Amino acid sequence: MKSSRFHPEAIVFGISIALLATTTTIAAAQAVATTEANKVAAAIQEEKRLEALALQAEVKKVSRLDELAATREQLSPLELKELLSLVGFEGKALKEAWAIVMKESTGRPKSHNGNANTGDNSYGLFQINMIGGLGEDRREKFDLKQNSDLWNPVLNAQIAYHMSQGGADWGSWGIGPNAYNGGKAGSYYKWLDQYPEGK
C-alpha cells in the first residue's frame, strides 16, 4: 500500500491554474463589456449627431420661411415651389398647389380681389376668400387678427395646406370633384403644364 503524501506544490499549482482561468474569464468579460459599452456610446453619439443635423435643417427651414415671408412683391416660380414644399406639399399635391397659386395670384403675396359682386374678398397667394361669415369663421379658426394677415405668403400657404387637407382636396379653389363650380379649372391646366419640374 502506497502512502499518500501531501504535495503542497500541486495544490498551489492547481489554485494558480484556477486563478489564471478565472482572471482570463474576467478579462474576456471585461473586454466584451467594454466593446458593448463602446458600441452603445457610438450609437448615442450617432443619435446626437443626427438630432443635431435635423435641428440644423429645421433652423434653416425656419430661416428660409422667414426670408420668403418677407417677400411682398412676387415670388419667382422656383421660390414659390420651394415655399410650398417647405410648408408640406409634396409630389402631385405640390405641383397642383403651384398651379393653383399661379392661377389665383401669379405668385404675388399681396394679391387681393375685393369684388363682392363675384362673392370675393380674397387674399394672398391662394386667394383665400374672407367674404362675410366665411371671413369670421376663418379668422377664428386660423387665429387671424385681420384679413391682411393672409398677405404673409407662408401663413397663406400653411392655411391652404390645412384647407386642402395637404393637397388632397382642392374644392375650395374650384378644382376636382368637391369644387364649388363643378370643377371648371380654367387656366389651372395651363399653369400645371408650366410647373418647374426637377429644378
Q: Where would I find each of the regions flagged by the language model?
A:
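N-terminal secretion targeting segments of exported proteins
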Residues: M1-Q56, K60
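Flexible glycine/serine/alanine-rich "lid" or loop that lines and gates the nucleotide-sugar donor pocket
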Residues: M102, T118-G119
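Second-shell loop/turn segments in exported
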Residues: D66-T71, E82-G88, H112-A116, F142-P153
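Export/targeting segments at the very N-terminus of extracytoplasmic proteins
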Residues: L20, A42, E47-G107
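Generic secondary-structure microfeatures
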Residues: V101-S105, N113, M130-G132
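Paired acidic/hydrophobic, glycine-rich loop segments that form the ligand-binding mouth/hinge
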Residues: R108-K110, G171-S172
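Catalytic and binding regions of secreted/periplasmic enzymes and modules that target cell-wall glycans
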Residues: E96, N115, Y123-K199
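Hydrophobic alpha-helical transmembrane segments of integral membrane proteins
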Residues: H7-I11, N117, P153
